[in-house]
């Protein structure tokens, strides 16, 4: 008897356009002229450089160490010379620059000394977690949360189910589909490694029904220890909370994490990266990227991290046109960028070239309620929009802004052509900056009070000595 499936609220059935790329074998992208490696390609604290300008580095060598627990190292994705350490354009909705390490490839692609780990089943989960951390592995299907943090949470809590997420629901994107078709053994082995690392009772690999070839590739290798499920196509079913609801019927409470209900989820790409890290000693230095849209030869590429976006587009016959838009990610959740020299990073799953977008001007909200109907997080997007525009952060918290998964369903159905998700992202950034500033001020005050108390104590001790 098959697993009972459940429906998640809201969502959309929209054209997927995956046929542009999913049937073509992936290509290995040739070396670019420069590799640009941001120090922060993940949620958490940026890594700190351990090299200097002029140093020679090899492929797989650590060039920036993790700083703190929620952080991962950055590795050279090819051999060459460090030509700069400075601020460069990085994938960001607001066009910001961030610290990066720039490598001038020498063309030799020489590996650093890397060491595979012994049979994963013979080592303890904590050691396996550390191997995955040192490999710089983060979630490859979402915001880039450091994988070892999720794994550690798993060993500190009882994990009933590990979900390996292959539900690639965003239109145009087929990089996970190609990865599974071409390297199914990586997915299966990686899933078993992660299961061992979190000591999960059950393991499920979930795909969507428009991935029959990927399903068949996994089915040939799978045993009874892993359950393989194909789900009806619906957007955004690949969202963490939505997929948990569909597979288990459970809901992750607002402000809570999947681990709080006994579930850990990782992307298929993360599973494959774990396999390579453990069995080969290879850090995360490349990934599959879909390059699609208005291109002569759209397809999936295997790309070294740090490769400029323009270099990827060029492999697919890109020719710059007036009025076009470049999106990193898909059309629903992706970010519009103007600088094609920014690099592919650990979380880059797609480069999408589109004709002129947002041809119709934004109009006032008519409070039609369509956005409410399609919101998979059961929020009130029109209220979030109103309070985001007025920067009413207190009301945004009341309306659970941070439960928004930025899926873009609300923007898609909005008859007023309002880029709702853009407003939500901006508000989230402002709130986090405000909270960071408040923490800094509180820390400064604590230091001032402590220093004042110390000086007063020392002055009192000096007076006491004089009196004695």
Language-model segments: residues:
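Histidine-anchored nucleotide/phosphate-binding helix
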Residues: 181-196
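Gly-rich Lys/Arg/Thr-decorated short loops/hinges at beta-loop-alpha junctions or inter-strand turns
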Residues: 109-111, 139, 162-176, 295
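Short, well-structured beta-strand-loop connectors
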Residues: 52-65, 84
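N-terminal, Lys/Arg-enriched amphipathic/low-complexity engagement segments
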Residues: 1-50, 102
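Hydrophobic alpha-helical positions that pack around
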Residues: 199-309, 315-322, 330
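Ferredoxin-type iron-sulfur electron-transfer modules in oxidoreductases and energy-metabolism complexes
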Residues: 348-362, 372, 376-455
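Acidic low-complexity segments
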Residues: 84, 89-145, 156, 212
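Conserved hydrophobic positions within beta-strands
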Residues: 80-82
């Amino acid at each position: 008897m098959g697993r009972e499936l459940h429906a998640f609220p809201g969502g959309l059935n929209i054209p997927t356009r995956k046929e542009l790329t999913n049937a073509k074998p992936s290509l290995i992208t040739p070396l670019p002229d420069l590799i640009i490696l941001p120090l922060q390609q993940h949620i958490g604290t940026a890594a700190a450089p351990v090299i200097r300008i002029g140093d020679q580095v090899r492929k797989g060598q650590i060039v920036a160490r993790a700083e703190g627990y929620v952080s991962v190292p950055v590795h050279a994705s090819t051999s060459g010379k460090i030509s700069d350490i400075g601020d460069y354009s990085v994938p960001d909705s607001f066009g910001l620059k961030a610290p990066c390490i720039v490598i001038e490839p020498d063309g030799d692609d020489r590996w650093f000394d890397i060491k595979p780990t012994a049979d994963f089943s013979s080592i303890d989960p904590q050691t396996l977690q550390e191997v995955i951390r040192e490999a710089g592995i983060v979630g490859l299907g979402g915001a880039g949360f450091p994988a070892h943090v999720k794994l550690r949470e798993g060993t500190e809590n009882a994990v009933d189910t590990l979900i390996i997420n292959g539900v690639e629901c965003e239109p145009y994107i087929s990089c996970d589909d190609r990865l599974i078709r071409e390297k199914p053994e990586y997915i299966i082995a990686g899933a078993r490694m992660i299961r061992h690392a979190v000591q999960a009772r059950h393991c499920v690999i979930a795909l969507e029904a428009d991935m029959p070839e990927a399903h068949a590739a996994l089915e040939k290798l799978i045993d009874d220890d892993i359950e393989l499920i194909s789900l009806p196509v619906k957007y955004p079913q690949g969202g963490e909370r939505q997929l948990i609801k569909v597979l288990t019927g459970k809901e992750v409470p607002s402000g809570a994490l999947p681990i709080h209900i006994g579930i850990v989820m990782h992307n298929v790409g993360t599973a494959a990266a774990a396999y390579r890290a453990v069995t080969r000693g290879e850090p995360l230095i490349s990934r599959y990227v879909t390059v699609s849209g208005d291109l002569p030869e759209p397809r999936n590429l295997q790309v070294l991290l740090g490769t400029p976006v323009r270099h990827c587009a060029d492999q697919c016959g890109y020719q710059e046109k007036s009025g076009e838009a470049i999106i990193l990610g898909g059309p629903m959740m992706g970010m519009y960028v103007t600088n094609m020299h920014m690099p592919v990073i650990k979380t880059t799953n797609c480069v999408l070239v589109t004709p002129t977008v947002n041809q119709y001007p934004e109009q006032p909200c008519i409070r039609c309620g369509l956005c409410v109907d399609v919101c998979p997080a059961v929020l009130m997007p029109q209220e979030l929009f109103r309070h985001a525009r007025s920067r009413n952060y207190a009301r945004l918290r009341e309306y659970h802004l941070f439960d928004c998964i930025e899926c873009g369903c609300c923007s898609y159905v909005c008859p007023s052509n309002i880029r709702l998700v853009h407003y939500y992202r901006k508000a989230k950034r402002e709130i986090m900056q405000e909270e960071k500033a408040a923490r800094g001020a509180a820390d400064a005050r604590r230091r001032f009070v402590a220093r004042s108390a110390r000086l007063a104590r020392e002055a009192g001790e000096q007076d006491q000595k004089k009196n004695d």
